[in-house]
């Protein structure tokens, strides 16, 4: 069996290296991009989002991983001239298994530009073992600085498009209500927190978080607490919220 698996890996690597199609002539893949890979940056992708999404353009760029949330990975790049931080979502999906997308890792990503619910994301990434394909995720370095912007509720508005997918921190949030998702899906156990900061309402959405004993962290942990949170800015129902993907990103203060 290992003998045949090696043949399959080599065949797949060759097809990627030579840009051979994996579909027959009578089965056209509508999402297949036949053009050259565009070497760019996250800023370049965001600036050309509409056209790149339309053409399902394949891009290659460097970025630093900020947070992991199951199938979703968040990444950033800092403009060396302006210091501006640009962020993007990498859709890992169910099939991509790699240790290269850990927080603080600087990597080269190759994938297709797509859009989901109005937000740009990178799909169709690969990291095939033993393959030398340029399309593989490339680890450049580990332990890189992750830029986290401190924000207040006045900045957390959808017109501030530069915050989308950014890693932010908000301090001194007074929790006033909590709600746990219970709809029979994979998000069961996720908690939505409504809080007040600087006199304004803010919404915090957690992933399904697990404690050190592998128990799901329940909403009562947050009730009536004063907290600082670090998370990813996401749009939901026309408003921004902060998505927390690790309990270590929540700091609790004594009342």
Regions found by a protein language model. Name each.
Residues 4-255:
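OB-fold nucleic-acid-binding modules
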């Amino acid at each position: 069996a290992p003998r045949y698996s090696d043949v399959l890996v080599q065949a797949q690597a060759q097809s990627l290296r030579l840009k051979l199609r994996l579909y027959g002539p009578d089965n056209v893949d509508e999402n297949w991009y036949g053009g050259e890979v565009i070497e760019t940056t996250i800023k370049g992708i965001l600036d050309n989002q509409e056209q790149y999404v339309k053409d399902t353009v394949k891009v290659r760029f460097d970025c630093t991983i900020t947070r992991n949330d199951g199938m979703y990975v968040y990444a950033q790049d800092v403009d060396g001239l302006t210091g501006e931080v640009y962020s993007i979502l990498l859709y890992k999906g169910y099939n991509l298994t790699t240790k290269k997308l850990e927080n603080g890792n600087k990597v080269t990503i190759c994938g297709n530009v797509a859009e989901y619910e109005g937000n740009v994301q990178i799909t169709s990434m690969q990291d095939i073992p033993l393959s030398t394909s340029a399309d593989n995720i490339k680890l450049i370095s580990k332990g890189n600085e992750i830029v986290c912007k401190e924000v207040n509720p006045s900045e957390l508005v959808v017109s501030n498009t530069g915050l989308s997918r950014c890693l932010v921190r908000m301090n001194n949030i007074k929790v006033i209500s909590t709600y746990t998702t219970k709809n029979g899906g994979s998000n069961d156990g996720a908690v939505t927190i409504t809080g007040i900061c600087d006199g304004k309402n803010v919404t915090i959405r957690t992933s399904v978080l697990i404690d050190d004993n592998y128990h799901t962290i329940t909403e009562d942990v947050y009730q009536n607490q004063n907290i600082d949170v670090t998370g990813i800015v996401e749009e939901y129902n026309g408003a921004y919220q902060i998505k927390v993907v690790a309990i270590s990103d929540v700091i609790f203060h004594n009342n």
